[in-house]
Amino acid sequence: MNKRRIAALLLCIPLIFSGGCSLITVDQEKADAVENAKVLAEYKDVDITKGQLVQYMRQTLAQQGTTLEDVQADESYWKTYLNSTLNQLVIDQIAMEKAIELGFDQLTEDDNKKIDEEFNSTVNSIEAYAEYIAKAAVEDDPTKNYDEEYKNVMTTYFDSLGFTQESYRDEVKKNFILKRVYDDVIKDVTVTDEEVKETYDSQVTIQEGNLKNQPSFVEMQKQIGSKVLVYPEGYMNVRHILLSFDDETKSAATTAYGEDNKSEYERLTTEGKAALQTKIDDIQSRLSAGEDFGTLMEEYNDDSLYSMEPYNTEGTEIGPYATEDIPGYLDAVAKLTKQGQVSEPLVTYNGVYLIQCVKMLAGVVPYDDVKEEMTATMLSGKKATEWDTVTQGWMDEAKTAGVLKVFPERF
């Protein structure tokens, strides 16, 4: 039992005979109920309460891997987040009203089948998780009951989402209907080839200017998720074969490297490479004979990342301004000057790398190579803008008509 729980129990001891702890609990529950009942928005005859907003926030933030408390701690962001999230609940309410007006709430057998498929897919994933946790709990403590553990995990998981298993299907159904409204609003939004080409040309000009002043700017673009259309010299896509040292050698070499013990590091990596020399020779010999690098990756590679797509065939972007933790990796890449070329063996604390240039990237990315991706990105952006414009119009109209009032300050 941790110290906080012990302290809480000790505080209750003097009150046990008078029922103090239970009274405190009841009082707190009443206070919470009053707080959660605060009305933050009124739309016609529908109230949106603080409790509803908090539940929605916790659901969406959990999917993003963060918490409401974390967001509230960021004072510069909290007010914006509060207003936008409250507005979203209002928009959902208005959109559901629109759905009924348009008949989108009338579901066919096929519609219900799609809803069930999405619901069952999610539940099946949760059930697999619950089975794993329950099994582990029983293996760790045989006195525990598997069915009870399984039920507890399922209940806890759905509680964290703010649903029961039954009410979650209603949520899936609601989102299905709201998606119909969204699709109706954005159905006429398009992007022309001329718009895409104009954006491409503009971005190329801007990026060329940025790279001329600061070539390392390419890495900033990648970090913020901006599409790179112009690459500095030395950039390429690469993939590699890693021949790993045994765990003991790898651990010792990593320690020696971290402690800057150069003589010990040299000894360990030299011995480690010697143990792998037969494999190195075989790979290099077969490459010289014209064998495909990808085939050798499948046979020899100890780096699991490169067993997955797109890394297996396309590799990863790298260049002189990239950040790379593997000692000597950037230097080895810098010596590759043409597509298909393979580096000399690079020895590190992990093992031995043989790196292949998959594609040279320096210069302007051809328009045809990015047209489809840019079109999809621009179309998505225009749809989002159209949705925001229309839904803001709904809210403005409702406020003007006196049927919508929003009170974020009551939170």
Language-model regions, residue ranges each:
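Surface-exposed patches in mature extracellular/periplasmic domains of secreted proteins
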Residues: 70-71, 101-111, 211-212, 292-299, ...
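Soluble periplasmic/extracytoplasmic beta-strand elements of cell-envelope proteins
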Residues: 38-49, 56, 98, 237-244, ...
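Peptidyl-prolyl cis-trans isomerase
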Residues: 278-327, 364-369
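N-terminal targeting/tethering segments
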Residues: 27-170
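Secretory-pathway/luminal and periplasmic proteins that interact with or process carbohydrate-rich
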Residues: 121-133, 207-210, 303-312
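Proteostasis/folding factors centered on peptidyl-prolyl cis-trans isomerases
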Residues: 139-175, 179, 193-266, 298-303, ...
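Short, low-structural-confidence N-terminal segments
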Residues: 1-83, 87, 221-232, 247, ...
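Solvent-exposed, polar/charged alpha-helical surfaces in well-ordered, non-transmembrane soluble domains
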Residues: 51, 55-59, 80-88, 92-97, ...
